[in-house]
Amino acid sequence: VDGNHENFDLLNSYPVTAWKGGKVHEVRPGILHLMRGQVFQIEGMKFFTFGGADSIDKHYRKEGVSWWPQERPTEEEFAEGMKNLEKHSYSVDYVISHTAPLNVVEKLTVCSTLLDPATIMLSVFQEKISFKHWYFGHFHQDTTLDNYTALYQEVVPAAGTIA
């Protein structure tokens, strides 16, 4: 999934194709960008994906060079996510996002600038769906809080957590 420091002009120039039930950008053969608001069925498991987040340092960056406004998820992407989740009865095995829902963000940081629209959208998804585990990045730490795992340097298999 995308984060908040991607070159979205480049990322969005790749062809959109269908893969495992959802939409992806094919960056190279075998290298896929799992697009926002998609449900993928992989090896008998369902994954919901929703990338993006606001950059807290964007005032130091230059638009189109080191910062892109497309880092912030749109209402259309949110609506597509809801539509796709409804098709799966709001039930998935795993969620993969860049940032996290508000209640998780509050446990990880006291920085209110991290409470961006993506966080709010994820909180709405969180209220509607059932899932086994939620994986996210953005906070540059490896930690598990209940069934939410922040990943930075660790790599874990689905259903894995940080000890």
Regions found by a protein language model. Give the residues of each.
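Active-site environment of divalent metal-dependent phosphoester hydrolases
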Residues: 4-10, 40, 55-58, 101-105, ...
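C-terminal capping/extension of enzyme domains
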Residues: 47, 135-163
